[in-house]
Amino acid sequence: MFAIFKREVRSCFHGMIGYVLTAFLLVASAIYFVALNLGYGLPDFGYYTLYNTIFMLLFYFPVLTMRSFAEERHTRTDQLLLTSPVPVAGIVLGKFFALCVVFALPCVVDAVMILTLWALGATAASTLANFAALLCYYLLGCAAIAIGVFLSSLTENQIIAAVAGAAALLLAYLMPSLRRMFTTGSAVALALFTALAAVLSVVAGLRSRSFTLGCLTFAGCCAALTVLFLLRSSWLTEGFSAVLSALCLFAPFEEFVNNNFSIPTLVYYLTVTVLFLFFTVQELEKRRWN
């Protein structure tokens, strides 16, 4: 795993991609830091700088993660990885930790900015809150990296991986607004749950290579949804609202930096990270045995 980790870090900075992405995020942070924190004397680094750079992450992470596995498939070097004695989990973690190190570089500079505010008179409580916000920001980034790595494992085209990653993060970014639109009634929840059931059934059928299993999965999901709609429609609405809330990747960070320190928010980002790393391992395991 360590050899893969070193190889991935080296590849990020062998060309310009690592330097360009790091500079991109640093410039964005520096602009808000100088204009708001220093210009107006605002000690809240989490809200005025980190939160304002969230939109930049929609471009940063897809470009950072697009080549992690897509390039390996395109150059056929993934066959060497999959036939090596290294466990699939070790391959995934090696690449994941390498990308996390790349993302940590601008975060280290952000930490220096927080210390600068402290040196200029920010209180100890404000400084601790800023470091807590930076920790949450980093865990958010780790979750986004895990999502991007998973999407990269599904294709051999880096552009497709980047576009899919940007679309997924944009959807998560807009999800709070979409949640307000789609939780207006049980009929809307039923329709969207049915669409989700169709997607899951297609995935189940493709992974098992069984059309019958896909059809049975869809029929079972539709039957369960119909029963819920007729007998407990409120459960359907509440359940769909909970699903949409879980897809709001950036909303918990917004609440966190608004002086709402929350351990569940940190646990949420760790859970998303582990979940998508697990999905990536399963995808590579399937290809290894095929």
What are these regions (language model features)?
Residues 19, 89, 158-159, 264:
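Residues that define the loop-to-transmembrane-helix transition and helix capping
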